[in-house]
Each structure stands twice: as structure tokens, then as C-alpha cells.
Amino acid sequence: EYTAKGNLVGVISNGSAVLGLGDIGAQASRPVMEGKGVLFKRFADIDVFDVELDLEDPDELVTAVRAMEPTFGGINLEDIRAPECFEVEDRLREAMDVPVFHDDQHGTAIISGAALLNAVDVAGKSVDDLHVVFSGAGASAIATARFYTSLGVPKGNIVLCDSSGVIGTDREGLNEYKAQFASETDADTLAEAMAGADVFVGLSVGGIVSQEMVASMAANPIVFAMANPDPEIGYEDAKAARDDTVIMATGRSDYPNQVNNVLGFPFIFRGALDVRATEINEEMKRAAAEALADL
């Protein structure tokens, strides 16, 4: 009430997983973090300090961020690689009395979740019957898969694929986060997994989905090809792959139906700061997705 803390968010990164650039380090990540601050201010009038930490050890990251709690009304974690990002966020949420939100995870989950809620209506499908295939098994994919289950998608109907193919229960050496979504399936490849699927969620690399793969999906498929700067399949190619309705979205602004985190994170933090929330919980995330879907 008496200081700027109530309208101040820390955008904190170690630059280990910058979108489209990878592990470029703390210093090189600064333009991205400054840009994030501009979006916070432009859309939600939230002040931001960007903090780039030259730290890779999760223990050191947690200690450094916790020490900044007196300064910030909320913490936006950004571009921290998986699987360390899960541990870092979980520990900070437990330890801190201000909202801690890893946007690469939850921003993507919320915005694509809102898109999913509307897409099922257009496609004449039901959330609780969907079969969903993910290309990608990093922070955003795992968080989005978790969020889809909270929206009603059966966990057993979700298949995750990484660079080695389908993540099955027979795969050895999985980290605990990928193991949560290991599937009982005969499919080995992304192409095999997509056959008959209702939804494709791309959070991986460009150009890995063919028209034949889209053609193999269930009737009126939903295709969220969100890799940037190049989607897993182009908008025109996906639409031309079938004669029925293809609900197609990408992460790009030059195609229709852009799925972009900027639709969420400024306003989610605005609401959390205004009510002096101590966390951004699952109910708040679902409410944000449902509100976006209703726009």
C-alpha cells in the first residue's frame, strides 16, 4: 500500500532455454526479458525489473530468487530449461508469499487451453473424449498436458512425443516429469501417434508434421502448431490436407488464430497483484482460460 512493491514484478531468467535460441546464457537473454517487461507495462500497467542470473544450479537459483521476495509483488520465471524449471518453480512457490509463475509452462497452458475449449465447440467434440498428441516434452508441453487434464481431458488419452519418438511406459531413463505422461501405446513415432487423434499440440520444432499426418487424424481435427518462428506445419498446408474442417492455430501473428502467451500473463499478474494473492493456483489458471474462451 505504501510502496511500489504491489505493482512490481520481477522477470527472472538464467537464459538457459530462450525460445528459438536455446541456452544462450544470462547476459544474452536480457533483450528478451526487457521485451517481456514492455509487454507487462503496455497491457497491464505493471512495472518490471528484469533480473538475469548467471546461475545454473537449481539450489543457487532458488536461493537468489527467494532473497528478492521483499522487493517484488510477484515473480515471473522465464526461459529456464527443463527439467530444472519444474523444481525451481515448485520450491519457490512453497517458500515464497508472493505469486511465482513460470510463464513458459503456465502461460502456454492457459492460452492453448482457452483455444482448446473453443475449438472443441467448433469441431463438435467433447473435452472428455479427446485423444491428444503432443510434439515436444519440455516445460511448456508437460505443463500444457497437465492443464488439459484439469480441463477434463483423460490423462490416458494424452500421448507425448520427444525427439526420440513416443514416450511409452517401456522407455528407460525418463525423468520424473516425462514419466508422468508415459503412454501405454503401440505407436512408436509421431506419425503413428497422430493417426486417429483429435488434437495435435506442437511445442517442438518447425516442419516436422506432413499433410499426410494431418490427413490421418480423426474427423474435424484440431491442430495447434505453436513452434516459433516456424510451426510444425504451415497454416495453408494443414487446411489443405483435408476436406473437412481443420481447426488450425499457430504461434505466429501473420496467421489466423494466434496462440500467444501475451494474451494471458499481463492480466493474470494484474489480477493477482490487485487482490494481493500469495500464489497463482490451478483454479485461477482455469478461470483465466475460461474467461479468454468467452471473449
Model-assigned labels for residue ranges:
Residues E1-P99:
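N-terminal ligand-binding/catalytic initiation module
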Residues Y2-K5, K41-R42, A67-E69, R93-E94, ...:
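Solvent-exposed alpha-helices and their adjacent loops that cap or buttress functional pockets
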Residues L19, I24-A44, M96, H102, ...:
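Glycine-rich phosphate/diphosphate-binding loop of Rossmann-like nucleotide-binding domains
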Residues E34-K41, V62, R66, F86-R93, ...:
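Predominant activation on well-ordered alpha-helical scaffold segments within soluble catalytic domains
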Residues S13, D50, N76-D79, V100-D103, ...:
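General beta-strand structural signal in soluble alpha/beta enzymes
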Residues D103-D104, A123, D129, A225-L295:
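Adenosine-phosphate binding glycine-rich loop
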Residues A179-I247, R252-D254:
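Rossmann-like adenosine-cofactor binding region
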